[in-house]
């Protein structure tokens, strides 16, 4: 639950924040006012909105997917690939497929085993054993 001083206007919340210097309090107040304005805009009917969020979102998607080189010599797509490879949100296919940056650690004769969708013999045996144990109780 929010303290009573933090409820109400964004300016009151910024003023109630302890030990903020005036610049930080002003920045916080500005951010909270902008946030309130966006929420109010979303609450209004679609045709009365002040900003076209869908167009902005599409423009940002196009910008982020475009391959534009910066001064570092790396393109955005190369940066995105390395970020994608270092992410924890891989699918099994991405984890088990080699990439250009993956060192060739596995020899051609050693291939990792993948579990198959119908490969449940150990689980079935465990469940059958559990059923027998429960039946004997």
Swiss-Prot record:
Residue numbers carrying Phosphothreonine: 111
Effect ascribed to mutating residue 111 to A: Loss of phosphorylation. Reduced stimulation of CDK1 activity
Induction: By Epstein-Barr virus (EBV). Up-regulated in aorta endothelial cells in response to complement activation.
Highest taxon above the source species: Eukaryota
Subcellular location: Cytoplasm; Nucleus; Cytoplasm, Cytoskeleton, Microtubule organizing center, Centrosome
Tissue expression per record: Detected in brain, heart and liver (at protein level). Highly expressed in liver, skeletal muscle, kidney and pancreas. Detected at lower levels in heart, brain and placenta. Detected in aorta endothelial cells. Overexpressed in colon, breast, prostate, bladder, lung, and ovarian cancer tissues.
Classification via Pfam families: RGCC
Keywords: Cell cycle, Cytoplasm, Cytoskeleton, Nucleus, Phosphoprotein
Modified residues (Phosphoserine): 67, 69, 71, 75, 91, 97
This protein's GO CC annotations: centrosome; cytoplasm; cytosol; nucleolus; nucleoplasm; nucleus
Primary localization class, coarse: cytoplasm
Residue segments, region Disordered: 1-20, 57-80
InterPro entries registered for this protein in UniProt: RGCC
GO aspect biological process, one term: cellular response to hypoxia
Gene Ontology MF terms in the entry: protein kinase activator activity; protein kinase binding; protein kinase regulator activity; R-SMAD binding
Biased composition (Low complexity): 65-80
Function: Modulates the activity of cell cycle-specific kinases. Enhances CDK1 activity. May contribute to the regulation of the cell cycle. May inhibit growth of glioma cells by promoting arrest of mitotic progression at the G2/M transition. Fibrogenic factor contributing to the pathogenesis of renal fibrosis through fibroblast activation.
Subunit structure of this chain's protein: Interacts with SMAD3. Interacts with CDK1 and PLK1.
This protein's name: Regulator of cell cycle RGCC
Organism of this sequence: Homo sapiens
Gene that encodes the chain: RGCC
């Amino acid at each position: 639950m929010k303290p009573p001083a933090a409820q109400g206007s964004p300016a009151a919340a910024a003023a109630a924040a302890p030990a903020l210097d005036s610049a930080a309090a002003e920045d916080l107040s500005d951010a909270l006012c902008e946030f309130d304005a966006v929420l109010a805009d979303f609450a209004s009917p679609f045709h009365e909105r002040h900003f076209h969020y869908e167009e902005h979102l599409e423009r940002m998607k196009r910008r982020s997917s475009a391959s534009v080189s910066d001064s570092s010599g790396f393109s955005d797509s190369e940066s995105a690939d390395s970020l994608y490879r270092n992410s924890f949100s891989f699918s099994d296919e991405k984890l088990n497929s080699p990439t250009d940056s993956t060192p060739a650690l596995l020899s051609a004769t050693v291939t990792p085993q993948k579990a198959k969708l119908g490969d449940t013999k150990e689980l079935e045996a465990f469940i059958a054993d559990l059923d027998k144990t429960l039946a004997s109780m």
